[in-house]
């Protein structure tokens, strides 16, 4: 089923309103989440000379911006939630852009790496090819995209007050390859648990060149 422009605007507005209303609780609830495995997965595949220019896509309150900055890199944050943008700026001292995922305005070939941790699943399936293309264009040639999302059976819709699209590996792989990325690795999280207890699908991709 195709989503019309008004429906897409409503999806963004209502999902972002949820995060706006719960920003403080979200910050406290995720403050101590260990995503070091994900950060390492992005950084080890970047072949540029450090410090790396990084985009934290869906940076939330700025936890991972702080980590990238502490590692000596040059991160920029992006989020569609005004409260998160302000929190991230204050917490990290980094540049943070307020942008809706469905209305991006990204510089071309700016970043060595893009870190999309728990963010791209909010993009409706029909819009993903366009959004992935915009992320690809924002990477330098050979740049790296990391993505981690709740996995599923390719259904999408409302999960309480948030909209989400939940892909399995094969479908996600097809989407990324069609958008001009080549696979580097993928894994399930949290590490060390049986697959049925690993709700997160993480993957790393390089911008493919013609």
Give the location of each predicted region.
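Conserved class I S-adenosyl-L-methionine
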Residues: 2-49
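Class I SAM-dependent methyltransferase SAM/SAH-binding core
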Residues: 55, 61-103
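A short acidic, Gly/Pro-enriched loop at the edge of an enzyme's catalytic core
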Residues: 102-114
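A short glycine-rich, Lys/Arg-flanked "PGG" loop and its adjoining helix->strand segment in the class I
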Residues: 129-141
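Conserved beta-strand signature within the Rossmann-like core of class I S-adenosyl-L-methionine
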Residues: 142-149
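Acceptor-substrate binding/catalytic loop of class I
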Residues: 155-171
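Core SAM-dependent methyltransferase catalytic element
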Residues: 191-210
């Amino acid at each position: 089923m195709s989503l019309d422009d008004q429906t897409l605007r409503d999806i963004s507005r209502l999902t972002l309103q949820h995060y706006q209303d719960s920003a403080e609780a979200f910050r406290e609830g995720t403050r101590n989440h260990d995503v070091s495995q994900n950060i390492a997965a992005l950084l080890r595949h970047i072949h540029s000379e450090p410090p790396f220019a990084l985009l934290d896509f869906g940076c939330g309150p700025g936890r991972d911006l702080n980590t990238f900055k502490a590692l000596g890199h040059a991160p920029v944050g992006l989020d569609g939630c005004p409260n998160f943008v302000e929190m991230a700026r204050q917490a990290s001292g980094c540049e943070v852009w307020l942008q809706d995922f469905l209305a991006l305005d990204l510089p071309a070939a700016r970043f060595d790496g893009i870190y999309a941790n728990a963010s791209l699943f909010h993009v409706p399936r029909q819009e993903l090819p366009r959004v992935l293309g915009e992320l690809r264009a924002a990477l330098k040639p050979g740049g790296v995209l990391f993505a981690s999302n709740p996995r599923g059976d390719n259904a999408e819709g409302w999960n309480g007050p948030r909209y989400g699209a939940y892909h399995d590996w094969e479908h996600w792989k097809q989407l990324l390859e069609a958008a001009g990325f080549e696979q580097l690795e993928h894994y399930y999280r949290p590490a060390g648990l049986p697959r049925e207890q690993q709700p997160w699908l993480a993957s790393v991709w390089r911008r493919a060149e013609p």
